[in-house]
Amino acid sequence: MLTSQYLLSTSKDIPYDAKIISHQLMIRSGMIRKTSSGLYVWLPTGMRVLKKIKNIITTEMEKINALEILMPIIQPEYLWKESGRLNLYGEELLRFLDRRKNQFILGPTNEEVVTNFIGSEIHSYKQLPLTVYQIQTKFRDEIRPRFGIIRTREFTMKDAYSFHINQSCLENTYNKFYDSYINIFKKMNLNFCAVKADSGSMGGNISHEFQAFSQNGEDEIVFSNDKLYSSNMNMAESIETIDFFKKKYSSCLIKNKTNTKKSIIMSEKLNTPLINQIQTFLIQTKINDITSIAALLIRGDHELNFFKVEKIDIINKPLVFLNEKEVISLIGVKKEFLGPLGLKVPIIADISTFNMKNFTIGSNINKHFFINVNWNIDLPMPIFKDIRKVTKNDLSPNGSGYLNIKQSIEIGHIFQLGQKYSRKIQQSVKIKNGNLKNLYMGCYGIGITRIAAAVIEQHHDKNGIIWPDSIAPFEVVILPINMKKDNKIKIIAHFLYKKFKKTGIDVILDDRDERPGVMFNEVDLIGIPHQIIISKRSINYDNVEYRERKNKENILINIKDIKNFIIQKLKK
């Protein structure tokens, strides 16, 4: 490729809404351009990166005998009604009518479609197992698209689906995908980990997320310092420390007046640390199809884990908290003064409050709190559940390490779906005895466009992107200095360019009449890993200058040796 025939589209400007480094560098390096909220045009440089990511994924899919297909992005709505996910997905689904008033959606995922058509293609257990995959654009109507391509409305995914006659066969394929994903992300030089995860709206009982570490990640992953435990934040558990306080029980209830509104200020006014306070939240419940209210109790320095709360049978999904107006109407007090004493509703407390003594609660009277409160003396024991987010230095569930928490970007997710979709969409095969049996199913996703951002988050410096060789838009760039003024430089530049092209090296030659500073700045910004600089000074000694993007080390290499040198570099 010659730069004179290429659309570089680099920029010095950073859009006001580009808050994280990957978004900024993707704009500045000419990879993407925004057309609307959560919608982006992929320019040639970005497309070259995506193509290489896809090639790595396709190669690994072929190794595990996954067959490539392509499904329509537009899906009939009735399939989603059959699976029960139409209402579950809610407003993230873009729904529309065609000219005949038929109902369709713009697909965010393809479990319904693939189950429907595979069920009509497979008639016997002898055709199983079968795995298919596609690389396709998806659409989810995100309420708040943000962080560039990390959270968009339109994105490219590799989604795969496997079909089996029994659970053990499903588990075998699931493990193959797990190992395949490890290989894929290693080839992209990502710092990542696989963690146990919740299946969410996808269904099934077992799933794993693949998370790339990033301080700008939306997700949080939890792992022990002994590396024996890992989980996403939703699923993370800890062993509760025993008996935080050594104070004696007191049955004394004391009203303490304060003008405090916020918890942390309240703590200072009462001289009571947050660790010795219990917060109360009121939420909607549904018992025997009757909507009611329940109270959640959590330690003052902890945070509710919405995912864990939603797992409780009586809790409405999604969670609905009573607002200030509703609390005042029901209890007659502002939310910050809510407490469990005297509430005639089910009370669910986090297990971390079990061993608390002489703690502080709201009194259900404005500007008043109760202190020195104890279970079984002043308050009846509530229902205890694990409803909080773990915190750093909590004891690991295995008891042999302490928990750490890091931010991350989800780049892949695999699920054992079991028979969820085949039962609802009624797809089955004949087994040996002639009876029909519902298919077992797994699904396996990789966020292709999101991977590009995750790699940039991990591989960049003040000058731009530092792509690994495997997914760089170009492997090598040739930078001839003052080529328009020196014909010998031009001849050598084109000679090396043709030599690299013939060898199969992905090379670009900067044949523009640009100042050296502009050329160097642009290739550093774009992140091309291997740079060959041809100048009058170097060719006088039959040399060219080699510079590696990641360490900026400059080496003089003889012209006749540079091809083999680059080949060896690319093999590393």
From Swiss-Prot:
Gene3D superfamilies: Anticodon-binding domain (3.40.50.800), Bira Bifunctional Protein, Domain 2 (3.30.930.10). One of its GO terms (cellular component) is cytosol. Its EC number is 6.1.1.15. Its main location: cytoplasm. It holds the Pfam family tRNA_edit. The keyword 4Fe-4S does not apply. GO terms for molecular function: aminoacyl-tRNA deacylase activity; ATP binding; proline-tRNA ligase activity. Catalyzes the attachment of proline to tRNA(Pro) in a two-step reaction: proline is first activated by ATP to form Pro-AMP and then transferred to the acceptor end of tRNA(Pro). As ProRS can inadvertently accommodate and process non-cognate amino acids such as alanine and cysteine, to avoid such errors it has two additional distinct editing activities against alanine. One activity is designated as 'pretransfer' editing and involves the tRNA(Pro)-independent hydrolysis of activated Ala-AMP. Belongs to the class-II aminoacyl-tRNA synthetase family. ProS type 1 subfamily. This is Proline--tRNA ligase. The lineage of its organism: Bacteria, Pseudomonadati, Pseudomonadota, Gammaproteobacteria, Enterobacterales. The gene is proS.
